[in-house]
Amino acid sequence: MSVVEIEDGVFESTATIDNGSFGTRTIRFEAGRLAQQAAGAVVAYLDDETMLLSATTASKSPKEHFDFFPLTIDVEERMYAAGRIPGSFFRREGRPSTDAILTCRLIDRPLRPSFVSGLRNEIQVVVTVLSLDPKDLYDVLAINAASASTQISGLPFSGPVGGVRVALIDGQWVAFPTVEQLERAVFDMVVAGRKVGDDHKDVAIMMVEAEATENVIELVAGGAGAPTETVVAEGLEAAKPFIAVLCDAQAALAGAAGKETAEYPLFPDYGDDVYYSVASVATEALSEALTIAGKNERNDRTDEIKVEVLNRLAEQYAGREKEIGAAYRSLTKKLVRQRILTDHFRIDGRGVTDIRALSAEVAVVPRAHGSALFERGETQIMGVTTLDMVKMAQQIDSLGPETSKRYMHHYNFPPYSTGETGRVGSPKRREIGHGALAERALVPVLPSVEEFPYAIRQVSEALGSNGSTSMGSVCASTLSLLNAGVPLKAPVAGIAMGLVSDDIEIDGKTERRFVTLTDILGAEDAFGDMDFKCAGTKDFVTALQLDTKLDGIPSQVLAGALAQAKDARITILEVMAEAIDTPDEMSPYAPRITTIKVPVDKIGEVIGPKGKMINSITEETGASISIEDDGTVFVGASNGEAAQAAIDKINAIANPQLPKVGERFLGTVVKTTDFGAFVSLLPGRDGLVHISKLGRGKRINKVEDVAKVGDKLRVEIADIDNRGKISLVLVAEESETAADAPADAPVDAATTSS
């Protein structure tokens, strides 16, 4: 991979992505021109029009009191990148969009484990979107830009990290697909990894974020291959060559423009002497405590042992209490992993493929449109569904291609779910990420707006947490949506998997052993080598998220984990089906929404001047009305009668049956003038009773003497001129004409016309 010095001190390297018949994409990395005071700054380009600046900086002194690595990732979306002015009141960018937050998480997940352990200097990576071609997504380019700027910054970073989006289109995995190409994809994956091995030829997958597309069921029905576990595993392998090319380009740039790695003070969690002392004091008691099945009881006992250890060693290691706590945690991790690898048993007594006790229930919140409670062991999730008019869809003001969102999934994780105290209020990045994962899992099975003309808000309340509340949210949401009457194309369930690996000595030989865990606990998530969440129907995967701490997972191990996840998913789906397997009747508290179509040229008439007509229909019927630009009208009401009344009035305007001469109506006076009274016959259709016709043969001087606005008048159409103007005459009341009426007189049109 060559590097070009395009001017003094400005270097550029290029990665070419070859997609065969789908064409090529070019990713360029440039260093030395912009943000030169940052420790490392790189401009990344995707083809010619998408441009990102990533700047990495580090604090001069470490935060010694921190017991974690203070890495911050920020993504700044600039609206000028798309040639737009922000839609906020102040017309400038404010809090980050959901897309920006999710991109921050995509960058953080592979970058964080690539820094040397024990680093306590604050590190900040800021990615600014400077220009964006609307046909492209910027998130994957941001991963590469962040890695490249960090790689040249002189920080102790074991990169570079390459990130790629691959989509399965017409049977081929296409890298860096356009938004238009994604519409034809059945599956979409963001994969990040780095090159490993002595010769740096292997690629270790570090992070995966994947989903089936919104059109997957229609595409599969049309002959496309379903995204099964086997297909997903093939996609991960297909991503590796692209990642290698991106890593090579970044490494070449770092070779030309990178700084020497500086010396940074490292703060190991504990010293070897502390660990040895903790292990000698606590191993026996801790091993016994880790066999307690209940989370609270187990945590109480391990906390007691920790206090005993601190008391016994406090004098010996005065001032190093934090090291004692860290060593105790490390010992706990070792014992948990040891038991899994040697005995194939876990801290709660389960085997490696066992799922905790499952429970599913619907209709748990009285007035909610749909609700459900899903429990898996000590993880407890309540799902609540709310239905409303499509106009209540979320409007999105970001750089992404999505401008509105009809299905909104919100995830809440209150501190009491883990028995702790903490801040409540606006969602944190983790909550936004978990909600987005659950949302992606369900979008492929949602009905279209034509099939189900509602905006849907799904809220997942994590009431208890001990392992994968995000996958519990998928299960609770499926149950809740069905309870609300949403006709899902298929039910979806999710499960969290884990992986533990180590070198085990057997008969004098050392071998690498991998054990995949089904339905991991919170502790197994923290102490394991992989966190792998998988959601899907009984037939295919709808969403997948993977993070690993290992330098590569053998493909057969990953394939086995996917198959193990499917077995668990099928088991959970069977339990869910016992609670509800088809959509329920809609709640009486949910609005009844109907759609009708009106000619586009009639939209203005339905709305009326300054909204007068549509507002009057809303006031008279109590229905909510929303009109789209294509003439689709959504009518919502608390009952069917109100909705039908509104539909009748709209149809009378937009799809009218033109009145004929001789028809009679019971109309309402809507306006009086010096020359007569205007009478409303149908919505949007008025006629004039001339003043000379108002006196029933007698002369009147003032229209208001005989007709006031709001009066009901029985009228007959006397004439319709070539401009459509209607002339009316009064019809004698029945009491006045009953004696003279012939036997075959026509029925009053007021009872037959509309």
Curated annotation (Swiss-Prot):
Binding sites annotated in the UniProt record for Mg(2+): 525, 531
Class of this enzyme: transferase
One of the protein's GO biological processes: mRNA catabolic process
Catalytic activity: RNA(n+1) + phosphate = RNA(n) + a ribonucleoside 5'-diphosphate
Start and end residues of each KH domain: 591-650
Cofactor(s) essential for the protein: Mg(2+)
Keyword Cytoplasm: yes
Record EC number: 2.7.7.8
Keywords per UniProt: Cytoplasm, Magnesium, Metal-binding, Nucleotidyltransferase, RNA-binding, Transferase
GO MF annotation list: 3'-5'-RNA exonuclease activity; magnesium ion binding; polyribonucleotide nucleotidyltransferase activity; RNA binding
Compartments it resides in: Cytoplasm
SUPFAM superfamilies the record matches: Eukaryotic type KH-domain (KH-domain type I), Nucleic acid-binding proteins, Polynucleotide phosphorylase/guanosine pentaphosphate synthase (PNPase/GPSI), domain 3, Ribonuclease PH domain 2-like, Ribosomal protein S5 domain 2-like
Disulfide cross-links: none
Domain named S1 motif: residues: 662-731
Function: Involved in mRNA degradation. Catalyzes the phosphorolysis of single-stranded polyribonucleotides processively in the 3'- to 5'-direction.
Name of the protein this chain belongs to: Polyribonucleotide nucleotidyltransferase
Species for this entry: Mycolicibacterium vanbaalenii (strain DSM 7251 / JCM 13017 / BCRC 16820 / KCTC 9966 / NRRL B-24157 / PYR-1)
Lineage: Bacteria, Bacillati, Actinomycetota, Actinomycetes, Mycobacteriales
Protein's gene: pnp
